[in-house]
């Protein structure tokens, strides 16, 4: 007789510890039911991982599942698993019916990540019970302290439960109690207990593996040969002895008055199930944990290899009741040897939870990889060429993130991922895309279109302006919608030229400020509100203004008072630099006619790709962040962003995100945007390159230079976007990456402790102007016909010692010579930001880079104060700063105050410079006199000469 089939006569059911789609679909499960009498199936994450990762049989189902819309990795896996469980349950249903619900079950496990969360375990188990919708389902719940109350609750709801990760006799007693109490509650609520089944899954071979290891240690240390023999005799005996004693406990628990009362109502006993019965020690019989654990009302769930082995040479007998006294003696002997079985089983539960979580990580990684393959055109591609040293560091850090569940904890808003301060209060951006009200944006967009505005102007700074600027530059003017402009400057020329570029009578203004207290958008609003009032009348002016702000801000009050057309509210838990995928970016996008439904749909693909269920090696945002952070720790802290022509403005947004998030506490990453790519010889060993382009922008020359950098040992990340419509994916990728990099660096990426310092200085200066009508006097260290030079006493002394004297060139030469390996030079120009000035600053910076071999920044103030200014003041002291100010050819008054735009800009420049010098930065200010174009040309030539 078939030995497997013979187990039926001894009261034991055989379940199969294996499941795969083809295995069920091809009739193999049905064959085992018919030939071997298999009466159930168990599954776990490891089983599913092997099935999905090691074959292509799930490729088509994954593709079909995603045809109806993208799914998160966990959702996608669950859909596959539920289908597999349903199919297996249907095959086993005749067994279930024939045996009146005593057998014929398929087990599906709740997420191992929930093993220490009672409420979440209950919620998931109840949901899976409903999703599968089969009476012969058993939901697997671990026998952790948090799992026990969940078991009782679920049994009390009439859900059949397979209790897993059971090692200890004591815990088994608690498991049985949870089952009995749950049955009593179910009965009391009017339920029929005959519909409920449960098994208590004792993990067997893992006990021997753990105990044998400790016995081997004892044997190695023992000197007495008799003691060595006694200890050796215990090897391979403990797991079976423990199981036999548990079975004796089972017989006691499921007898007597309490059980009789439940049984009379149709309750079934909670059978002991022997799990982990594949033999791990090759010195033991491959059917040891089957042959020695045969008994009435038990289940043995076996892997296919063990099933085949038992069918081939197994022998069935009533072994579970044999040698009970010997089993007691074996356990007693172990205790006398100084080995605590209780301690071992407690540790095995902890290890089991971790092993199951590890298996789930591998499973979700496999599903994520398959999903990415199916969606290949829908998700922007990323490749990392990091070199050996950095690559190993990223791999090690990634493994730490996986083991410590930091991705899930990040999404759960666990501040301990970072510094444990207030990070949990600033993570609303994680879900802002999913919560976007597309219908409302679409309705608003249509109202804008009907009003035939010629222009739309965003008045904002930092996160309120840079994201909209990227969108405006990337998408351009859309047919039927206004042209989107951004104003983020107090420079009078920039304000005037913006005004000249629009038709003020047919322009809508978006005043964007989270706090409502930011100086620049407030004075810009005051200026343009007055201009609109002049153009269309004061009573109608408010109808041309919108506000985007946080609830309760001062801007909300002003907007209400002045009759703004609408107020859009942001989420107070989203910081400005993370707000582009919230109303601060989406309102300007909608105003400009960008297809938000498409933008959000495409962005959500990246959100899901970076989700809590995607392990580090398959998570693009986390991978980028780990690489950025690890590179920073290795001294490669100059994150050099290379953006192709179609997305050329992306770096302006990314540099704020990176600098303001990481540049603090004396450390951080310094973003380098807009530097023209060159040969390896001009770069130091502090670079980390990120290259972004759309896939239709071929540039062989650029690619050749990138390859040369890679071959020279520089880390290079390549990101290829499907099209500009995927820009939202890059916003989210970089947000996740920056948050992760902050954690790797050990800083809080959501505060900006040094930004306020410059604001305070500026307010002090403008307050003085309001009182006296002039800014406090300042004395240059050198004054020439074309420029004045300013710095503090410490910098002046150092520069004079280095050769600075009475001419501009000597000061520039001494100042730029202070830059060395690992430094960067930042040009901070408080002038109009236009193409000509951008080109001139570019000439200056490239000359510095090529001669000094240092990273360079070219920034315009006051714009950069809300962007990279945080890193310049609070980050590493590796910056050499050249501030450029100039006489304004004209000025513009700000309605309602003495200080003009020019005065405010001057105060901002002075406040910024004062804070830089107070922080001990190497800083020099050059104030150009007279005509700005001539002054910039002179300065450019002076810099070129100073470098030679």
Residue ranges, per PLM feature:
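Catalytic alpha/beta core domains of metabolic enzymes, predominantly
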Residues: 159-305
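Flexible, acidic glycine-rich loops studded with aromatic residues
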Residues: 267-371
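Conserved, mostly hydrophobic/aromatic
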Residues: 44, 108, 139, 154, ...
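Active-site beta->alpha loop and helix N-cap motifs at the rims of alpha/beta catalytic domains
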Residues: 47-150
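Extended, charge-enriched "interface" segments that sit outside catalytic cores
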Residues: 376-450, 728-730, 741-744, 770-815, ...
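Glycine-rich phosphate-binding loops that contact phosphosugars or nucleotide phosphates
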Residues: 446-614, 688, 692-695, 704-711, ...
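Active-site phosphate/pyrophosphate-binding segments
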Residues: 534-689, 698-699, 736-850
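N- or domain-start disorder-to-order transition segments that initiate the globular core
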Residues: 1-27, 397
